[in-house]
Amino acid sequence: MFDGKSILITGGTGSFGHKYTETLLARYKPKRLIIYSRDELKQFEMQQKFHAPCMRYFIGDVRDKERMHRAMQGVDFVIHAAAMKQVPAAEYNPTECIRTNIDGAENVINAAIDNNVEKVIALSTDKAANPVNLYGATKLASDKLFVAANNIVGAGASRFSVVRYGNVVGSRGSVEIG
């Protein structure tokens, strides 16, 4: 499925992106695997770990529509894992949470449509099912944007889907242990 394809992972330096990169490289031979993240230190650390010639690192933020558009040129698949997911930070910085989780989702969708990306898979959370905080509410809105994008493209090239999952042990999520 991913052999010979170009794949972009937004939030690629996060817990999911890091593990997914490991899995992709072990199972497939992608033409390009682009890690899109605003964290240059984590990108540097990933460069030290993953030496596959297909790896590319793109400093960028999903809130920047022009940068997002450029990063998706020639991409076949997008895994959208970028999010502001720390619940207390989202509550204290609501505008930044909305800009990242909702506006960022819209930027991913528009860039994918404009670049004829074959498939976009957006990661979501169980907190979007019955939101009780801003993080859950923004992820619910994001989910709806991705699903509705299929109506916008109609029979067009791009397809969009959302995968919701719960808290993952060992991730840098918002669950406090102890």
Regions found by a protein language model. Give the residues of each.
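N-terminal Rossmann NAD(P)H-binding glycine-rich loop of SDR-like oxidoreductase domains
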Residues: 5-27
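Conserved residues in the N-terminal Rossmann fold of short-chain dehydrogenase/reductase
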Residues: 37, 58-59, 99
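Short, conserved SAM-binding/catalytic segment
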Residues: 46-55
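Conserved Rossmann-fold NAD(P)-dependent oxidoreductase catalytic core, especially the SDR/UDP-sugar
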Residues: 77-80, 84-153, 158-166
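Conserved glycine-rich Rossmann-like NAD(P)H-binding loop of the short-chain dehydrogenase/reductase
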Residues: 25-42
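Conserved Rossmann-fold cofactor-binding substructure of NAD(P)-dependent oxidoreductases
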Residues: 56-77
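Adenine-nucleotide cofactor-binding loop residues
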Residues: 41, 63, 85
